[in-house]
């Protein structure tokens, strides 16, 4: 906005000012004497202002010369020169205007009046018209605007003729007012106001310059100070680091020289280790654990607490009985005739004893030392102690018999003395409190104690004697070790002296005689233990089980609920653990050759199950044994369903799996097979009856009876593996070498069975199985299966002028195009490829696009549930699939062909092609079996495998 006062420094102009009005218009503005107006820039024509201006001019020049050397610098001097030139031109311009005529002067004054007076009117400020045509007023305004430092664009300065304003027509027309802009310097000022304005601006610039200079200087000082401070800090850190390094070096030297520093360092290391263990323990506690594992641990801890309470009560009862027996023995010893006789003989022979003491004193000390050393050795040796604990229970009975026969012999006394010392040490060990373990896996440390070892020995011996006396029985009386025999010989030699009888009588008088009632003590101990130990249904006590330390548990600790099925090499039962009440699966291994040792098939199964731990493989918990070694059981997690029986139930209800469920099951199966193959394990018996499904939808592979580890290079194994319906064609054609592709073929058959709820190749024999495979997939040849003609079965057939029926086209797409997608067909064809080298691997099948297309595999937890037949107590119906081969030369018959009709001329008419001619009997059904063979083969030979009755 333009300053309303008429100047930048706020000076007010009145109408009485000489520079405001022209001479011809004094009367026109007389009534507005009190109003305030803005003085336009114009030159004064009065003569009195000349000396004053000259004086100011000289003062300005002096001031300019004075300030030229001041702070302003070259920029201020240049600006002053510019303004000085402007003033000289202005004076020259107005000097020419004064020489004009009065009319021209009046017109000029009128022009200046309109230029100054009409500008502040509101309509002229609000409306800004377009730039007018070039005129003198516009030129004059822009000329002043440019010279006063405004931002308007410079215009070209035109020189007008001297008689421009003196024209006749120019005075009649009104002068056009130029477009005003709201500029700070839009109004022109006189020389004094301009001087003051310039001075104020210069002072302001100088002040800003000085202020900026001081600010920069202060900032530089601050930066320098901070740099100095930072450098000092870095220097201090450098010195601290160097001193710390030197101190460390000195400490290392002290540590190597002084053992105290080493001890201190070890103590610090231990403290750090303990802190680290505490942190790890806190992290482990924060990590969420499996609920089943926590429940199992809680049950084990509860069983541990219960056993601890039983031990405490048994210990208290035993202590009370000991006190009672001591009181009875003291009372009976005081009145017994043997005690009286011993006291009398001791009184008579007291002088003899004193005399003979120096002679045998050294021998007696040596014997005592040897006995103490023997006792310490026996205590430290766990194996000898476990054997002697059984014999110590029978020592009183043996001593009573020995005293009747050899009452005066010193040998019996030495054995009695040794048994007394051992029994005392055992009683002291019983009284000591045993440290209880912290974790369930370390509960078995209790078994290492002498008390627990003695208790478990006695209980197990009693239970074994009650259950089966004809089975393996532990001999309770065992021979003493060579160390004890040597001590006994030394005792006999040392005690062969006249004073030995007196010493024995004195010992018998001073010491207690716990062997007087040994039978009662043993009965009471066993009775107290029987009251505290848990028993099974028949009343037979169960031994304490501590995993990780003790051997195999007994199968009697499990309650058999019902039989589930019979596997390849054993029968599976559903049972309940009597300690934890958990439902488990017990698989009994067949021990047909137990006299020759543990069967190799059972060892392979246990080994592969322990090596192949995976979420989709059955979990082995432990191995338990029966009363005899011919009964061995594998304890596994119980899974509710097997897929064979489940699919039969669904088929009876006219149900089938959804595509997402098929993908979920196949994906879990492929994961398990891939894990086995990564661990160099062949399952060799994959089928739906060996696939288990839990209520949570988790598929688990079971029955590892035919599983075997393989290696590189691949060895020759028996081809009589895998159940017939899921057997690969290379096995059916007696290939001597096979590997993981045989499991992949079985997975392909199972995948097809998931899709159609029926077996894909339900052959009755190897011949029928091959015929079904070739009919479904087409007959192979050397082009699609390199090395096909080199297989033993094919080579023998060709040598005998026999061949298979040709099926050129695969029927797989025709049968499954409505049951799965194109990607599903591609996966099925990849799994059922003839050439084992071109067949998909389990890892490659997992990456197939079938599992990535919609619908995606469902989550196992979303799987529907069905009631398990085994839980209802009903025996599960046997699956309709054939049993797997038992292996070796004792394999059983896998199936039989259809009955063969013998036609006239004793020729077979079951569709078999003899030579190259078809027999037309029985309707000419030569395509029913598709196998071409020579004539004269009996029915029994056709039913045998694996070589199709051909001797290779």
From Swiss-Prot:
Biased composition (Basic residues): 53-66
Compositionally biased tracts (Low complexity): 457-470
UniProt cross-references to InterPro entries, sorted A to Z: CDK, CDK11/PITSLRE_STKc, Kinase-like_dom_sf, Prot_kinase_dom, Ser/Thr_kinase_AS
Phosphoserine, modified sites: 439, 442, 449, 881, 886
Any one Gene Ontology BP term: regulation of cell cycle
Active-site annotation: 685
Annotated Basic and acidic residues bias: 16-26, 78-93, 169-196, 216-240, 302-333, 357-378, 503-538
Organs and tissues of expression: Present throughout the early embryo. In late embryos levels are highest in the CNS.
UniProt enzyme class: transferase
GO terms of molecular function: ATP binding; cyclin-dependent protein serine/threonine kinase activity; protein serine kinase activity; protein serine/threonine kinase activity; protein tyrosine kinase activity
Cellular compartment(s): Nucleus
Residue ranges annotated as motif Nuclear localization signal: 51-56
PTM-bearing positions, type Phosphotyrosine: 447
Catalytic activity: L-seryl-[protein] + ATP = O-phospho-L-seryl-[protein] + ADP + H(+); L-threonyl-[protein] + ATP = O-phospho-L-threonyl-[protein] + ADP + H(+); L-tyrosyl-[protein] + ATP = O-phospho-L-tyrosyl-[protein] + ADP + H(+)
Domain annotation Protein kinase: ranges: 558-851
Binding site for ATP: 564-572, 587
The keyword Nucleotide-binding appears for this protein: yes
Family according to the record: Belongs to the protein kinase superfamily. CMGC Ser/Thr protein kinase family. CDC2/CDKX subfamily.
PANTHER family according to UniProt: CELL DIVISION PROTEIN KINASE, CYCLIN-DEPENDENT KINASE 11A-RELATED
Name of the protein described by the UniProt record: Serine/threonine-protein kinase PITSLRE
Source organism: Drosophila melanogaster
Gene that encodes the chain: Pitslre
């Amino acid at each position: 906005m333009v300053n309303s006062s008429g100047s930048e420094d706020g000076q007010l102009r009145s109408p009485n000012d000489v520079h405001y009005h022209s001479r011809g218009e004094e009367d026109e503005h007389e009534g507005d004497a009190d109003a305030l107006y803005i003085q336009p820039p114009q030159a004064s024509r009065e003569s009195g202002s000349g000396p004053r201006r000259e004086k100011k001019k000289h003062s300005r020049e002096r001031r300019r010369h004075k300030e030229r050397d001041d702070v302003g610098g070259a920029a201020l001097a240049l600006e002053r020169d510019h303004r000085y030139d402007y003033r000289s031109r202005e004076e020259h311009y107005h000097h020419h205007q004064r020489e004009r005529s009065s009319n021209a002067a009046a017109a000029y004054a009128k022009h200046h009046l309109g230029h100054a007076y009409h500008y502040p009117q509101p309509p002229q400020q609000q409306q800004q018209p377009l730039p007018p045509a070039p005129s003198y007023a516009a030129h004059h305004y822009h000329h002043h605007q440019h010279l006063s430092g405004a931002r308007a664009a410079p215009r070209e300065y035109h020189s007008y003729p001297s008689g421009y304003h003196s024209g006749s027509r120019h005075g009649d027309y009104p002068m056009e007012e130029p477009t005003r802009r709201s500029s700070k310097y839009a109004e022109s000022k006189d020389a004094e106001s301009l001087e003051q304005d310039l001075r104020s601006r210069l002072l302001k610039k100088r002040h800003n310059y000085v202020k900026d200079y001081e600010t920069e200087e202060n900032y530089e000082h601050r930066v320098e100070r901070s740099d100095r401070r930072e450098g000092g800090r870095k220097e201090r850190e450098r010195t601290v680091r160097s001193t710390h390094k030197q101190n460390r070096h000195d400490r290392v030297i002290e540590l190597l020289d002084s053992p105290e520093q080493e001890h201190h360092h070890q103590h610090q290391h231990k403290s750090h280790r303990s802190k680290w263990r505490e942190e790890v323990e806190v992290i482990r506690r924060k990590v969420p654990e499996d609920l089943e594992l926590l429940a199992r641990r809680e049950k084990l801890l509860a069983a541990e607490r219960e056993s601890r309470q039983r031990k405490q009560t048994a210990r208290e009862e035993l202590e009370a009985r000991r006190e009672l027996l001591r009181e009875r023995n003291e009372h009976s010893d005081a009145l017994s005739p043997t005690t009286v006789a011993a006291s009398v003989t001791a009184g008579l022979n007291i002088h003899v004893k004193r005399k003979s003491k120096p002679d045998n004193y050294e021998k007696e000390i040596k014997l005592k030392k040897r006995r103490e050393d023997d006792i310490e050795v026996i205590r430290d040796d766990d194996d000898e102690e476990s054997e002697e604990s059984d014999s110590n229970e029978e020592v009183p009975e043996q001593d009573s018999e020995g005293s009747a026969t050899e009452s005066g012999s010193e040998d019996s006394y030495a054995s009695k003395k040794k048994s007394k010392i051992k029994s005392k040490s055992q009683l002291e060990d019983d009284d000591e409190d045993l440290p209880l373990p912290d974790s369930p896996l370390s509960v078995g440390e209790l078994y290492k104690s002498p008390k627990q070892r003695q208790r478990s020995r006695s209980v197990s011996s009693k239970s074994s004697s009650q259950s089966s006396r004809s089975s393996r029985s532990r001999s309770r009386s065992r021979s003493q070790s060579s160390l004890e025999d040597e001590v006994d010989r030394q005792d006999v030699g040392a005690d062969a002296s006249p004073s030995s009888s007196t010493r024995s009588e004195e010992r018998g008088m001073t010491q207690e005689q716990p062997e007087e009632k040994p039978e009662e003590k043993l009965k009471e101990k066993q009775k107290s233990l029987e009251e505290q130990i848990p028993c099974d249904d028949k009343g037979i006590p169960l031994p304490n089980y501590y995993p990780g330390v003790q051997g195999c548990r007994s199968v009697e600790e499990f309650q058999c609920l019902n039989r589930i099925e019979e596997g390849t090499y054993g029968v599976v039962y559903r049972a309940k653990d009597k300690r934890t009440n958990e439902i488990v699966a017990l698989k009994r291994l067949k021990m047909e050759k137990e006299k020759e040792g543990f069967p190799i098939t059972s060892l392979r199964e246990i080994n592969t199950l322990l090596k192949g731990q995976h979420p989709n493989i059955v979990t082995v918990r432990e191995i338990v044994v029966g009363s005899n070694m011919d009964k061995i059981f594998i304890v596994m997690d119980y899974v509710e369903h097997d897929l064979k029986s489940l699919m039969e139930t669904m088929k009876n209800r006219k149900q089938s799996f959804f595509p997402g469920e098929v993908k979920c099951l196949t994906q879990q199966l492929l994961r398990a097979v891939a894990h086995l193959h990564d661990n160099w394990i062949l399952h060799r018996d994959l089928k739906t009856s060996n696939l288990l499904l839990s209520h949570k939808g988790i598929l688990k592979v079971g029955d590892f009876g035919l599983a075997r580890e393989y290696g590189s290079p691949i060895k020759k194994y028996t081809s009589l593996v895998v159940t017939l319906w899921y057997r690969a064609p290379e096995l059916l054609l007696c290939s001597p070498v096979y590997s993981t592709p045989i499991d992949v073929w079985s997975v392909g058959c199972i995948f097809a069975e998931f899709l159609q709820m029926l077996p894909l190749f339900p052959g009755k024999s190897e011949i029928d199985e091959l015929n079904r495979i070739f009919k479904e997939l087409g007959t192979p040849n050397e082009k699609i299966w390199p090395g096909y003609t080199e297989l033993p079965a094919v080579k023998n057939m060709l040598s005998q002028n026999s061949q298979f029926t040709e099926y050129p086209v695969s029927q797989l797409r025709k049968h499954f195009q409505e049951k799965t997608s194109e990607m599903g067909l591609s996966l099925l064809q990849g799994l059922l490829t003839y050439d084992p080298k071109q067949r998909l691997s389990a890892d490659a099948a997992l990456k197939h696009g079938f599992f990535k297309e919609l619908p995606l595999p469902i989550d196992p937890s979303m799987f529907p549930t069905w009631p398990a037949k085994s839980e209802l107590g009903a025996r599960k119906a046997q699956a309709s699939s054939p049993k797997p081969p038992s292996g070796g030369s004792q394999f059983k018959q896998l199936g039989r062909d259809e009955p063969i009709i013998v036609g006239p001329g004793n020729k077979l008419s079951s569709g078999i092609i003899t030579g190259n001619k078809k027999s037309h009997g029985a309707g000419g059904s030569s395509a029913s079996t598709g196998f071409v063979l020579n004539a004269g083969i009996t029915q029994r030979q056709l039913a045998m495998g694996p070589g199709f009755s051909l001797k290779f």
